[in-house]
Amino acid sequence: MDEQISKAVEIALSGTSDLVLKNQAFEFINQIKSTEEGYKSCLDILLKSINSNSPLNQEFKFFILQVIDENITKLNNEQLYELNSDLFQYLNYVINSNINDPVYLKNKFAGIMGNLFCFTYLSINPTFLKDLLALIADNNLIAIDIYSRIIIAVHTEISDKFISRSREVQDRNNLLKDQIRTNDMNLLVDNWQKILRNPELIQHNNEVLNNFLKIIGYYINWMEITLFISNDFINIIFQYLNKPDQRNETCLTLIEVISKKMKPLNKLELISLLNLTSIINSINNDDDLEFMENIAKLSNQVGLELVIVLESSELELFDSINQQFLNLWPSIFKFLSHEYDDISQQIFPFIQQYLLTCKKFNQLASIELLSSLLNKIILKMKFDDDDDGTDDESTEQFNEVRLKLKTFQDTIAILKPELFLEAIPIVINESIFANVSDFDKVNWRNLELGLFELNTFTESLRNNLINLPKQEIGNSKPYVLVQEFLIKLINSDVVLKVDHPKIQLGFFELIVRHYNFLNTNINNQEVILRILELFSSPLGLFNNSEKVRLRTWYLFFRFVKLTKPTLNNSSFIENLFIKLQPLLVIKAELPTKDEDNDTVENGNFNNQLNLFESIGLLISLLSVDISLKVRMIDLIFQPLFNDLENCISNKDKVNQQLIALQAHHSLMAIGTFARGYDYDYNNKYSAEIVGKINNASQVVLITLENFAKFEIIRDAARFSFARFIPILNEEINNHLSKLVSIILAANNLKISELTNFLNFLGQIVHNFQSNDNIYKLLNDLLSPLLDKIFSLLKYNGENNEYESMPDIIRDKESLKKSYMNFISAIITNHSSSLLITETNKQKFPIILESFFVYAYNTSEPTVSKLAITQLINVVSVMGGHGGKINDPQDKYGESLPPLEGVDEYLMNKAVQLSFELPFQKSEFDLKDAQYRLVGQEIASLLKTYQEKRGDEYLTFLSNYLTNMGLSSELMTDFCTNLVKVDQRAFKKYFITFVTELKGK
């Protein structure tokens, strides 16, 4: 067996073994791990290696230890006793033979001993720790090394606070700790102190020394602290702060020491006794960044512990605690000012807690202290001199730090508004405007800091951090000061002269974010023109940096949309639009593939659309003669029309995809321009403007006719028409029929495309519900549209492959929802008669049947609920009226003949659905929120029918419930509630009714 196990491990670890053989080896290995026979065999192999003095190879030994470790929890007390004896025998062998295994083997063995300790110390081997101490009595380095690892492993098992444990295990661990305190604590601590005091005993081995420092930090958490904090012991630990190889671990140990839970007075005495603030202030090892980071962590923990003491102590301790704070702040300031952010961030938690505590203890918030802190924070928020601000990753990291610093600054603003209002304007003024007469002296980092602080200062007013009465904010001195800063900045050339992306983007972001401060300016028109001029300069829309340029295109759109400037300077406007012409030239680029073979779209065009939308909005808002508006529209549209004409006439068959993409982009630009023009919904569009959009719709249709086989063209055409509707209104009638017929006739219409098309048609129904021409269009369209919908929903691919394709399943679910929402749009917009005209009445039973089919489909609860909603809509307009439409606002409803039998069909099927769905579908669980919503919708259906049909419905329902086997008492109660309570109350009743019946 020994040889089999050894061979199996060798094969499993081999990189060249036959795959079949390797799988067999793994199967055998797993069997060894999981059986008692395998465990015993591995333990025997380990013991034989001792007796024969023939060491195992390292990989095989690790496997043996792994098997032993994984089986400890399965052993009975007798087996645990034997294992305890065997492992101590093995440990003796390792020590006496001076076997220095690799670290991973030593740690694995230590982990086994730590695990074994938990099962043996209480009753099987109470001398476990004394036995360990006996092994290191002669100061053998290998023995002390393994001993330290076992002690750490015991900590991991019984008190590591980062490991989640069951209540049972935690109770056991508490008993283990109690027994250690009683039997072994003093011996252990004396031993640790001895080793740390005499590092020569372990030949100054750095790893072992660090292990013992860790042990102090681990065990002090639950041992008696007085054993550790005698002057002698503390001085021993402190001396390691001067040893390069131990000082980092020493910092972490001291953090654990001061973190021990204690009464406030005792904790304060401990901090005073350790005198850590003086020690920290005396350390200056800037060259060792890791050490400085750990010292900063230690400073931070001292501060946090003082905060905890203050918040949980009596007021008479305040002066002593405050003195400790004052002693600590020099080191906090030193670390906050450190050039490396990783070091500075270590003291952020303390700063945050201190500032929050200042809200409770005003005495802490001295002007002198907070002023110094604010100055340090501001300086830290500036880009470092060696950072050129162009690396995205480092900028992101810096912004994370800056965001935390801003939080501190905001808290200071709340604590001491007068300090904030005095300091920040000085920073803004000196950073932005100090060298306006000599731009060569302007450092972009200073300017960027000024822009950032101007932004934060403005936000502080918006959020009223300085606690002004709301009605006074707009007239307050800080508010006026912000306006002055913004106007001064806009009129200054400083951002034009400092060529840096951070300045350019920072400026435009600032202006857009705080546009409302400009809207109240008395010279608003002049300021707006200046901003538009800056946007259209090389600083913004024409910037050489693509990142700045594309972002500015979006910011330009946001600015125009937010401010809605009403411009009346004709020459400025005309020059502006002519200047922007080069940016409106569209050049399509086909998607490319990245290294992972994923499709990468060219993002420039989507950014370019922001310009078209901005210009559309600007033209719509012009306070000028209509002829100028028309000329501006021509200036935008004509190049697009020419481009589309070129696409249509281009017969290059090789580049059809690129040509279609070019046409798509031009159509999207036209539609997006129209969307911008429509932002002012109160606009009364003149005949000239309507004429221009009408021309555009004709161009769109011509393009669609020529590229009808391309989905992207159909999408773009639909997009454009959706944006034309508010402007053209009923003028669009002339074009819609053609648009719809071309799209529906497409042979390659996708499910997702039809889904979007139905949403578009729903918009048409809503906008033109009283338009006779649109009614006729929809009447002619409805039946073929329904055929298309049901055809796509039914088709599952040539070999039913769609049934297992999540994307197709999801698309079909979306199509069902859009189809039902379209029917809902017809009914709720008083056009229900469309469903039963002579043209469409043959489809109406199919529509109703689809609603019932979808309602019963519990695998799609959202679809089921929506289907029931549509049944409620149908019942509302047709239930109880002999198949006639009952909607006074449906002007064609009265003239149509009734549909025979629809009442009986609806009532019968609706009642069946209402009880079969919740009671016969096992997966219908009302504890599930989605099914609960379906149940509530069923209740609404029942209530709606009762309100429509009254006693006739109750009679039908009573007969159905009787046949279903419901008792007369329950049936009476159900019908009484159905009649007497409102819909909301009946929903609750129905849910309870179903829940209780299903529970019986």
UniProtKB/Swiss-Prot annotation:
Places the protein is found: Nucleus; Cytoplasm
Single Gene Ontology MF annotation: tRNA binding
One GO CC term on file: nuclear pore
Pfam families: Exportin-T (PF19282), Xpo1 (PF08389)
GO BP: tRNA processing; tRNA re-export from nucleus
Keywords: Cytoplasm, Nucleus, RNA-binding, Transport, tRNA processing, tRNA-binding
Main location: nucleus
Record Gene3D superfamilies: Leucine-rich Repeat Variant (1.25.10.10)
InterPro entries tied to this protein: ARM-like (IPR011989), ARM-type_fold (IPR016024), Exportin-1/Importin-b-like (IPR013598), Exportin-T_C (IPR045546), XPOT (IPR040017)
Family: Belongs to the exportin family.
Its biological purpose: tRNA nucleus export receptor which facilitates tRNA translocation across the nuclear pore complex. Involved in pre-tRNA splicing, probably by affecting the interaction of pre-tRNA with splicing endonuclease.
Descriptive protein name: Exportin-T
Organism of origin: Debaryomyces hansenii (strain ATCC 36239 / CBS 767 / BCRC 21394 / JCM 1990 / NBRC 0083 / IGC 2968)
Gene name of the encoded protein: LOS1
